[in-house]
């Protein structure tokens, strides 16, 4: 018998155009069970969100993909992944993507390796380290098409950390207002799930990093259910690789 929380989760996904196959449904259920088991020993997600894990964690991490989408076979970094969020939900949704889960806390990454193995996510790997240091390493420099971040740091810092890890790609200006949703992400991008005073954060990021192509999107999937995620937005940064390119 399906739990009511999962039934509601799947209904919201379906209404938002996310249709899950049976294997994906099972992976999501297994992931939540593993996350809860590990969370009793290691703080992978906040204790207060455990009660509403399907909405406050999983649904939040799927919400961006009703607004934007990646091309096929992308290499993506989940920066400051914590409990594998948003990287693991994306990996379940998009098994064609190569995803690296990065966190600086070894206890978390050790747990994530076990979770990834148990879920059979063959194209997901886990790394331990700090983004500001790994961006200078041969393994991580210019290695990714996109960087994801969820509630990790101010946008200005995320841009600085992401820039050296992104492969240079010609920027394509997309008219998102006339395009069909979810619109295709082009070029090198930072995808950040954010909340709070975004106006000030966006201004500071543009001034201090020189990146000007920053766009904010609502997450309509979250309006389908009562959550503690009111005011959450998606920020997409398309890197210019002009004077603001990697140094």
PLM features: what roles do these ranges have?
Residues 83-96:
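Conserved SAM-binding loop of SAM-dependent methyltransferases across substrates and taxa
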Residues 13-15, 39-40, 85, 129, ...:
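Residue-level signal for pocket-adjacent positions within structured domains
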Residues 80:
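Conserved glycine-centered beta->alpha loop in an early N-terminal alpha/beta scaffold
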């Amino acid at each position: 018998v399906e739990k009511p929380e999962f039934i509601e989760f799947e209904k919201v996904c379906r209404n938002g155009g996310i249709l899950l196959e049976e294997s994906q449904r099972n992976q999501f259920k297994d992931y939540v069970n593993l996350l809860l088991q590990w969370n009793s020993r290691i703080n992978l997600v906040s204790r207060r969100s455990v009660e509403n894990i399907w909405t406050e964690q999983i649904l939040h991490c799927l919400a961006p993909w009703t607004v934007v989408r990646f091309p096929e076979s992308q290499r993506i970094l989940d920066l400051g992944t914590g409990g594998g969020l948003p990287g693991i939900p994306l990996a379940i949704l998009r098994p064609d993507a190569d995803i690296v889960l990065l966190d600086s806390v070894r206890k978390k990454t050790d747990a994530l390796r076990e979770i990834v193995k148990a879920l059979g996510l063959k194209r997901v790997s886990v790394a331990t380290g700090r983004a500001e240091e790994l961006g200078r390493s041969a393994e991580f420099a210019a290695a990714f098409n996109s960087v994801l971040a969820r509630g990790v740091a101010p946008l200005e810092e995320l841009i600085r950390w992401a820039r050296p890890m992104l492969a240079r790609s010609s920027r394509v200006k997309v008219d998102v207002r006339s395009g069909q949703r979810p619109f295709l992400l082009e070029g090198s991008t930072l995808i950040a799930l954010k909340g709070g005073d975004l106006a000030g954060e966006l201004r500071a990021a543009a001034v201090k990093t020189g990146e000007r192509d920053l766009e904010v999107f609502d997450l309509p999937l979250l309006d389908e259910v009562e959550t503690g995620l009111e005011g959450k937005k998606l920020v997409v940064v398309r890197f210019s690789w002009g004077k603001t390119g990697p140094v």
